[in-house]
């Protein structure tokens, strides 16, 4: 029973719901430029392993800011130690990159994604604490590299307009993400784009980025992408002009949801998987910590 609880704790310690945006953009890229299905699913598994490693490193570095922002549960409560996280991260990254190289399944692009993810978190580079570079790193990681990996990193990569739209969309949502973490970032010395611009200008920039994402999606002629980008543009504009009615959290949750639905339009089982994961997460956090998570 104790071992089962430890395994369950670790499953949720990697924050599986945080993987949903990465999966969504990966699958959108896979749908836009189909590759051999067996290689696509293997690449998704390797991408997931790599992102788990990156997220574990991020949690180690952000231990204190997550505590302040009330986002930490496992390191902060002593359920796991930073050393255990580090060991798991090394194993995940080594396995992902090793198998990608052995199977010649986009190893170079996966390595770039891992390098960017680590540069985002790890000092002295730590792009997460550098205003502007934090935005660029997130947009490039989720909006550019994830769909490109989904397509297989080959000559069948999604078109320029498609990748421009996904990159701009991620940037728009990220602007609101930084607003949710202002207090913790300020107290731990992180100089994020949200802190530098402030809430008003951050919301305005997010709206502009979302509108540009919608324009690029229309140019890409991808219907599902266009619908998702259009919804994000409307939500972002509403948050900019009526922030009291449309919160940054609503934009983050809604933006994640519409792109997950766009991915599910091409991969229907993805919707069922995300719903099952959300339900399992809600039950786990209620029973383990007595709290409501995820909360809308």
Report each predicted region and the residues it spans.
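Multi-pass alpha-helical membrane architecture of UbiA-family
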Residues: 1-296
């Amino acid at each position: 029973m104790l071992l089962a609880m430890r395994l369950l704790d670790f499953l949720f310690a990697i924050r599986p719901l945080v993987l949903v945006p990465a999966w969504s953009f990966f699958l959108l890229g896979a749908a836009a430029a189909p590759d051999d299905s067996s290689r696509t699913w293997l690449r998704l598994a390797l991408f997931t392993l790599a992102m788990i490693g990156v997220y574990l490193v991020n949690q180690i570095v952000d231990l204190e800011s997550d505590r302040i922002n009330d986002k930490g549960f496992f390191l902060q409560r002593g359920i796991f130690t930073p050393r255990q996280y580090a060991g798991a991260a090394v194993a995940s990254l080594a396995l992902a990159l090793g198998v990608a190289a052995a199977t010649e399944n986009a190893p170079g692009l996966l390595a770039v994604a891992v390098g960017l993810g680590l540069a985002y978190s790890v000092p002295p580079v730590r792009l997460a604490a550098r205003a502007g570079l934090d935005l660029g790193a997130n947009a490039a990681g989720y909006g550019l590299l994830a769909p490109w990996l989904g397509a297989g990193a080959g000559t069948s990569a999604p078109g320029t307009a498609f990748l421009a739209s996904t990159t701009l969309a991620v940037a728009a949502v990220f602007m609101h993400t930084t607003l949710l973490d202002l207090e913790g970032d300020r107290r731990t010395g992180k100089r994020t784009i949200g802190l530098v611009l402030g809430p008003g200008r951050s919301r305005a920039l997010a709206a502009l980025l979302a509108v540009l994402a919608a324009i690029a999606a229309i140019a890409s002629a991808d219907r599902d992408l266009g619908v998702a980008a259009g919804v994000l543009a409307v939500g972002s504009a509403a948050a900019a002009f009526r922030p009291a009615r449309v919160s940054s959290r609503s934009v983050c949750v809604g933006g994640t949801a519409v792109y997950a639905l766009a991915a599910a339009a091409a991969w229907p089982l993805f919707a069922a998987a995300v719903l099952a994961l959300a339900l399992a997460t809600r039950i786990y956090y209620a029973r383990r910590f007595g709290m409501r998570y995820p909360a809308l």
